[in-house]
Amino acid sequence: SDSYILIGTDEYDEKIKTFFSILEGEKKLQNNKFFFEEILPQCFAQYKFWKLMSQTQYESYNEILQTMNVVVEFDRDNSDYIYNRTDLQNLPGKDFHKKKNLVNAFLKNSNISIKNLDTTNTKDAFRILQIWSENRNLKQTDYYQCIDALNDISQNNSILSGIIVYVEDNPVAWSIGEFLPDEKTYLVHFEKGDSNYKGVYQFINNATVKNLPETVLFINREQDLGDEGMRQAKLTYRPCGFINKYLAFKK
């Protein structure tokens, strides 16, 4: 298929500056003179950033972009964290000792059950989201994106999958993600839990991975968006690598 452009902005936060991202089909852009002379200048005139540029795009187009007075910078805040499935599933060694202890603390609850997230239980997931959302500035969270994802699942109209955890029939946590085309990587989009249950987030992280097919070898837990607390939390799970992203803008 031809290359195509995805234009986007965050409709939930007026402070987010507009950006565009480019998704490529089988026909690459490198030799597309019309794109670089006509389309891309229009994008930079209308939007402030080319966001989520991939490593391959950076290596392919950086020289061309320099001739257009476009600056490309490494975007650490939007680079994805990649983990070995076995690490998140088994929590081995001293590095994961605290995580395993918290999982075990959650397991002390009685009558824990795990179900696939589907049309029959999204109402329970919404209850958890509501508990999680209390006393938060929702515009600075992924609350609205979670609503969209849950609505898609509730309408059985989604490539997303997930699980929901119950303690004595009370919903306490859920996660949503999707399988990437290589089928070896699972991309985790959202995790939400009732923090009144000790270890709930460590458990939902671990349970999500344990419920995946054995063919999945890697877990992509997305970016930290520059949030220092989120960054430290993601680093404590010992990523095996990153998917680098770049940001481009006109001088």
Place the predicted regions along the sequence by residue.
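Conserved donor-binding loop and adjoining core beta-sheet/short helix segment
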Residues: 1-49, 166-195
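Conserved GNAT acetyl-CoA-binding A-motif
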Residues: 42-56, 213-222
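Short, glycine/charge-rich beta-strand/loop segments that flank catalytic centers
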Residues: 47-65, 77-80
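Conserved active-site alpha-helix within GNAT-family acetyltransferase domains
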Residues: 57-74, 101, 225-242
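Conserved GNAT-fold acetyl-CoA-binding loop/helix
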Residues: 136-149
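Aromatic (often tryptophan-rich) hydrophobic motifs at membrane interfaces
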Residues: 161-250
